[in-house]
């Protein structure tokens, strides 16, 4: 216990000690280095950086091969940049939530700090983040953008070590890096400077958030620099589960070297964090798209999670069972080590190389919704399909609370939900090598080789339906009944109705190899680029075969009479596909402050271990998902206006639909379909007078499904009957047709500094749950605010809040129910936004 307490304290103590030493060093060296250009960024300088990120002079390095990057005015693609200060002003709840600053990006952050579903306008995702990649210093964090129970923002945390982010949509990303056809967020780290400098901040929030952040950059020797920083925090969460909802931190360090001909940066990061994975709560549906609170359940602050169901034993987990803990949530223990090297070889030759090694555990401990709730009596003695009732002989059952408290009232509302545990161990190594040659004035040819090898070791325990009260901080319930004089146990002593429906172990291994060529040609005001890529993915996945067994040999313990168990044999699937991608873009600079562009690209989305290999046989895996994208844009800036507008037409084919049951088991045949989308994205700002600015991020999407002439079979929740629906022409699931954010801000200067106040109004238009479009999720509007005070050169005070009006808005309903998810009583399980959250940060810059 003592060692555990020391380990919990080690990270915040380490950060505090490093920053204390850094502050002393900064004071000691200020006088001796006064003649050097100061590296310390005061609050005012940080504001200047933020302003520059919203101009066309901002240099971006993502999505192009230009030495040193390209100015935004020269890029023939859509890219959003944000400085460290702008990231904070966006007040993101998580890494994924930050993506909302990019028009057309739709992160569903209602699941908590991690595990977000990330949608991109016109890219038909529907869950996880198949068309989104996270990069650190230009290197993808994992070889595949998503797996079941994993998307790459889950292994990345925002803190004061992040210098800026570049968010690229479509365009040239199909050729460079991991060849992502959708969107890529590239996070760049702060590095050391000539003058020791840094910051330390503390944050307190109304959900009992306590957080410390810090960064320190320093010189080591001539042209050698180092930095270290990180964060530690704990929080009860807006939805208090009766244990720490978020707890952990990370530590990041860099070592960099500058020379006359190039630069080198090495970086390392250790992340150890655990976060509550928030699951749907009950609501009442009125009509097709209006919702209100379920009696006794606050949809903004309540959760089923509780101390009573926190610790469980899962006998069906592969290898003989395991203990699991809800407090571990969607946890991450991950290590990173990478480096960037850029060198001018002379005579027009330039070399660039990026590598990253990372690995660790990304486990999930969470409740997953299944059937709707009902009374204890109806659950026991009816066959109502919407609640998964037991249909026991009348008067035969005994239902009592697991942790004492006597018998359960027959009128008590109850529900059974899956207590799922997924252990996921990932490893990844990647390298992106580029060699460029200036062929003649204005023309540069780049050849690149991208290699990555990555593995996945999983153990799943899906199902584990636990009977519990349908109340905030639920209590588990155990049930037995008498049948012909024999006592039968419907649940075990923990309240489990079963020991899993899908208890698999799997090991995946893959290698991707890609060669690409890119030519960039500047002719006066024209900038033309043409790039091509050929990529091969060679992957295998071994999944244990399951046999249903009676774990204890007792036919009267119904919960374990048919437990899917790995039987020692494996299904091996191999996936070996090669596909070319290409992109062509043309940018024309109309004036120093204005440009237009057009771009076309075609790319492919390779299959992953879970969504292409598992459940399929070698040679019979789904086809590649292919996209063709056409876009055009206009960029303009002046003292009064800033505008970055793009229009697009995106077409998909090769999409697959695989139905699953309430326990997560794949059922039925896969179906193929496509999509067709047109839309407009806008990022802009108006500055009508000094110190006032109105910023806008907006998108309009007209997207629908295509190329499926069959119908999708599903079970109607109300009638229990099997029905069929066609999806051609239906709105892309979970993507709002219209979304916009308006942020007016006003800065008031004083002799001692300044105060900036802003509010953000967000409108999210109508959106749907799945391909059927039968379950509407409605629309909603939110208000956020912020007040930032910069005091002298060294202090910053920040007060910010989200969802200040406690708006009830849904991003997801019950993912295990296809079609309408509301029962005859209008009850629906869904994930609303969290309620009002306010936090205060005090930061010292040195």
What are these regions (language model features)?
Residues 352-356, 589, 595-601, 623-690, ...:
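Membrane-embedded beta-barrel scaffold of Gram-negative outer-membrane proteins
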Residues 48, 62-64, 68-71, 76, ...:
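Extracytoplasmic beta-strand/coil segments of soluble accessory domains associated
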Residues 184-219, 228-241, 760:
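Short strand-turn segments of transmembrane beta-barrel domains in outer membranes
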Residues 525, 642, 649-651, 671-771, ...:
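Gram-negative outer-membrane beta-barrel transporters
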Residues 95-98, 117-121, 135-137, 152-155, ...:
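N-terminal periplasmic accessory domains that precede
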Residues 4, 29, 653, 690-693, ...:
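C-terminal beta-signal and adjacent terminal beta-strands/loops
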Residues 245-247, 251-258, 263-336, 363-424, ...:
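Acidic/polar loop-and-plug regions of large Gram-negative outer-membrane beta-barrel proteins
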Residues 140-169:
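Short acidic/polar hinge/loop motifs at secondary-structure boundaries
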């Amino acid at each position: 216990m003592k060692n555990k307490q020391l380990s919990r304290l080690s990270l915040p103590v380490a950060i505090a000690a490093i920053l204390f030493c850094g502050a002393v060093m900064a004071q000691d060296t200020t006088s001796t280095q006064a003649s050097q250009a100061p590296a310390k960024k005061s609050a005012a300088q940080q504001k200047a950086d933020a302003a520059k990120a919203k101009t066309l002079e901002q240099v971006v390095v993502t999505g192009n091969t230009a030495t040193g990057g390209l100015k935004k005015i020269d890029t023939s693609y859509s890219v959003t940049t944000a400085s460290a200060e702008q990231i904070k002003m966006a007040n993101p709840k998580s890494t994924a939530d930050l993506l909302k600053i990019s028009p057309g990006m739709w992160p569903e952050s209602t699941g908590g700090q991690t595990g977000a579903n990330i949608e991109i306008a016109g890219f038909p995702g529907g869950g996880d983040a198949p068309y989104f990649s996270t990069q650190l210093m230009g290197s993808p964090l994992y070889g595949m953008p998503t797996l079941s129970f994993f998307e790459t923002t889950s292994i990345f945390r925002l803190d004061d070590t992040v210098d800026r982010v570049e968010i690229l949509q479509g365009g040239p990303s199909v050729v460079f890096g991991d060849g992502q056809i959708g969107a890529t967020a590239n996070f760049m780290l702060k590095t050391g400077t000539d003058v020791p400098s840094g910051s330390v901040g503390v944050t307190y929030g109304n959900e009992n958030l306590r957080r410390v952040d810090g960064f320190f950059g320093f010189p080591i020797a001539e042209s050698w620099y180092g930095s270290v920083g990180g964060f530690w925090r704990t929080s009860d969460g807006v939805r208090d589960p009766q244990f720490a909802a978020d707890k952990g931190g990370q530590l990041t360090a860099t070592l960099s070297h500058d020379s006359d001909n190039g630069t080198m940066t090495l970086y390392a990061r250790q992340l150890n964090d655990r976060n509550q994975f928030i699951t749907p709560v009950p609501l009442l549906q009125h009509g097709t798209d209006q919702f209100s609170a379920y009696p006794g359940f606050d949809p903004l602050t309540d959760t089923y999670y509780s101390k009573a169901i926190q610790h469980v034993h899962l006998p069906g987990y592969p290898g003989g069972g395991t203990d699991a803990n809800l407090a571990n949530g969607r946890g991450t223990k991950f290590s990173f080590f990478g480096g960037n090297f850029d060198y001018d070889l002379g005579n027009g030759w330039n070399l660039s190389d990026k590598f990253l090694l990372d690995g660790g555990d990304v486990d999930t401990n969470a409740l997953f919704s299944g059937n709707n709730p009902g009374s204890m009596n109806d659950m026991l003695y009816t066959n109502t399909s919407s609640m998964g009732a037991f249909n026991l002989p009348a008067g035969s059952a005994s239902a009592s609370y697991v942790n004492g408290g006597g018998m359960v009232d027959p009128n008590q509302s109850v529900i059974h939900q899956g207590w799922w545990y997924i252990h996921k161990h990932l490893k990844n190594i990647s390298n992106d090598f580029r060699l460029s040659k200036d062929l003649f004035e204005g023309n540069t040819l780049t050849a690149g080789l991208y290699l990555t090898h990555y593995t996945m070791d999983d153990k799943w325990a899906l199902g584990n339906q636990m009977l519990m009260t349908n109340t905030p901080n639920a209590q588990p319930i155990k049930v037995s009944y008498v049948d012909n004089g024999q006592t039968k146990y419907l649940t075990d002593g923990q309240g489990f109705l079963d020991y899993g429906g899908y208890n698999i172990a799997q090991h995946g291994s893959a290698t991707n190899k890609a060669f690409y060529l890119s030519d960039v040609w500047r002719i006066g005001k024209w900038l033309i680029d043409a790039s091509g890529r050929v990529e091969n993915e060679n992957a295998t996945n071994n999944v244990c075969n399951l046999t249903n067994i009676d774990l204890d040999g007792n036919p009267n313990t119904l919960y374990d009479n048919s437990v899917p168990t790995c039987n020692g044999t494996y299904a091996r699937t191999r996936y070996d596909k090669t596909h070319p991608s290409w992109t062509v873009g043309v940018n024309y600079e109309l004036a120093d402050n204005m440009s237009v562009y057009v771009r076309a690209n075609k790319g492919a989305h390779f299959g992953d271990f879970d969504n292409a290999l598992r459940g399929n046989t070698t040679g019979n895996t789904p086809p590649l998902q292919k996209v063709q994208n056409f876009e055009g844009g206009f960029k303009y800036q002046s003292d009064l206006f800033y505008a970055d507008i793009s229009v697009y037409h995106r077409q998909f084919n090769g999409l697959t639909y695989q139905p699953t049951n309430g326990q997560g088991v794949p059922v039925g045949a896969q179906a193929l379909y496509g999509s067709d989308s047109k839309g407009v994205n806008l990022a802009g700002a108006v500055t009508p007078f000094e110190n006032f600015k109105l910023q806008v991020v907006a998108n309009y999407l007209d997207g629908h499904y295509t190329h499926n002439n069959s119908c999708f079979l599903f079970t109607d929740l109300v009638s229990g009957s099997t029905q069929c629906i066609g999806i051609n022409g239906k709105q892309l699931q979970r993507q709002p047709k219209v979304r916009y954010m308006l942020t007016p801000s006003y800065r008031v200067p004083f002799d001692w500094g300044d105060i900036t106040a802003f509010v953000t109004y967000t409108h999210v238009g109508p959106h749907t749950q799945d391909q059927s479009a039968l379950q509407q999720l409605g629309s909603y509007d939110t208000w956020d605010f912020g007040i930032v005070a910069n005091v002298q050169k060294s202090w910053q005070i920040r007060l910010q809040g989200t969802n200040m009006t406690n708006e009830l808005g849904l991003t997801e309903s019950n993912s295990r129910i296809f079609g309408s998810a509301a029962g005859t009583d209008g009850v629906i399980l869904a994930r609303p936004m969290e309620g009002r959250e306010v936090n205060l940060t005090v930061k010292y810059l040195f």
